[in-house]
């Protein structure tokens, strides 16, 4: 059951000034939220990543390659995706540039 909402954030590199960040666009998607598993956490730590949460989207087509998302007022970097049938899991870590 999809019981939560995240906002996938995409960048538009064509819309910016010379010294400005690219403009961003947010898209709302429904998901299920679960914690990152211990094995996943330990494997990621070996690569200097700190997975915190896994968002499961019921339809993999809803994910369009975004690198960041917003949930609960915080920005997260998407560090891993895993397709499982029609679903896709997005493993994320908290962004340091909030």
Q: Model-derived features: where do they sit?
A:
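Short, conserved turn/kink motifs that form compact alpha/beta structural patches or helix kinks used as
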Residues: 21-98
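Active-site-proximal polar cores
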Residues: 1-20
């Amino acid at each position: 059951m999809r019981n939560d909402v995240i906002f996938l954030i995409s960048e538009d590199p064509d819309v910016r000034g010379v010294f400005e960040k690219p403009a961003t666009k947010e898209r709302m998607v429904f998901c299920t939220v679960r914690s990152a598993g211990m094995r996943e956490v330990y494997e990621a730590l070996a690569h200097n990543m700190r997975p915190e949460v896994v968002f499961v989207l019921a339809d993999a087509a809803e994910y369009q390659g975004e690198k960041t998302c917003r949930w609960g007022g915080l920005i997260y970097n998407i560090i891993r995706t895993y397709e499982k049938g029609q679903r896709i899991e997005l493993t994320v870590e908290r962004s340091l540039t909030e």
